[in-house]
């Protein structure tokens, strides 16, 4: 994919930002409307990466140097530094690009090296990796990170758009690469269910030149016995229409596809009794038309 560029017409001039919902105690959500580093334009030049907050190696893998360019980035929103667990972070990446460019760049990594990720002082992640291998990382060469939000130090989300990545792909306001990075959380209970509701989400992006949108609400049931996310329902508002997408069952810390809908998830947080689940969703309709994607964090109680 190196060096290819995607040119699309009919772009939106700005991306709508979602306000974050609730959160309590040390799980307070930081909304996307916050501006990074106190800069009204949300712009940082030659940023200095901040290492994850705890339990991490400070030495990034030399094999992944190409995924850590010293680029010029702009930010919209802010997030806390995400806490690692024994040097590991959970990483979810969902590209919303035409399939020929997005291929093999979806990441669902419940335990990835914290030293392979780059989180800026603004809270934005500009390098993402599923392992320490050179082939398993993707960096932002230059451009915007928007809809940056977090839930305490448990998880942060955002979207790369109006940007170019280290694969050489460029993308627009309505496209992008969505991510969620959180503290890996092992579940201890082996029976029962938890009700999950939407806590924070980024914008719904379009693979091609369709309208971007918002995720109005999300709900699901977490089955502690089967370790699955059941009856996931996503309510989408895009353009002048609203519709619902459903996934009957998908594995926690895994990937499932039903029809045109693919669901990725990682379990994150600090309380096994009240876990958070970062969910990535994407669709790939037949004939290469349409297709949307995004990320959402669910609070399960």
Label for each model-derived stretch:
Residues 1-10:
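Bacterial N-terminal signal peptides that target proteins for export
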Residues 17-20:
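C-terminal motif of bacterial Sec signal peptides marking the signal peptidase cleavage site
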Residues 22-301:
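Mature soluble binding/inhibitory domains
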């Amino acid at each position: 994919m190196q060096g290819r560029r995607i040119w699309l017409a009919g772009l939106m001039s700005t991306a709508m930002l979602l306000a974050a919902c609730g959160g309590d105690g040390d799980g307070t959500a930081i909304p996307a409307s916050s501006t990074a580093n106190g800069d009204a334009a949300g712009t940082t030049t030659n940023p200095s990466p901040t290492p994850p907050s705890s339990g991490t190696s400070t030495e990034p893998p030399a094999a992944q140097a190409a995924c850590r360019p010293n680029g010029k980035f702009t930010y919209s929103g802010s997030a806390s530094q995400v806490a690692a667990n024994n040097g590991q972070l959970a990483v979810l990446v969902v590209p919303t690009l035409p399939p020929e460019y997005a291929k093999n760049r979806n990441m669902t990594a419940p335990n990835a090296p914290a030293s392979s990720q780059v989180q800026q002082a603004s809270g934005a992640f500009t390098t993402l990796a599923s392992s320490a291998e050179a082939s398993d990382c993707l960096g932002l060469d230059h451009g915007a990170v928007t809809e940056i939000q977090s839930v305490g130090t448990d998880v942060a989300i955002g979207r790369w758009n109006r940007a170019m990545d280290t694969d050489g792909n460029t993308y627009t306001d309505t496209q992008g690469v969505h991510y969620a990075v959180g503290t890996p959380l092992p579940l201890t209970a082996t029976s029962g269910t938890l009700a999950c509701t939407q806590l924070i989400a980024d914008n719904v992006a379009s693979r091609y030149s369709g309208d971007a949108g918002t995720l109005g609400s999300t709900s699901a049931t977490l089955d502690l016995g089967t370790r699955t996310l059941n009856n996931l329902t996503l309510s989408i508002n895009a353009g002048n229409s609203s519709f619902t997408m459903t996934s009957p069952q998908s594995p926690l810390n895994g990937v499932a596809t039903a029809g045109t809908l693919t669901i990725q998830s990682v379990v994150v947080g600090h309380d096994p009794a009240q876990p958070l689940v970062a969910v990535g969703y994407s669709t790939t309709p037949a004939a290469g038309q349409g297709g949307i994607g995004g990320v959402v964090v669910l609070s399960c109680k």
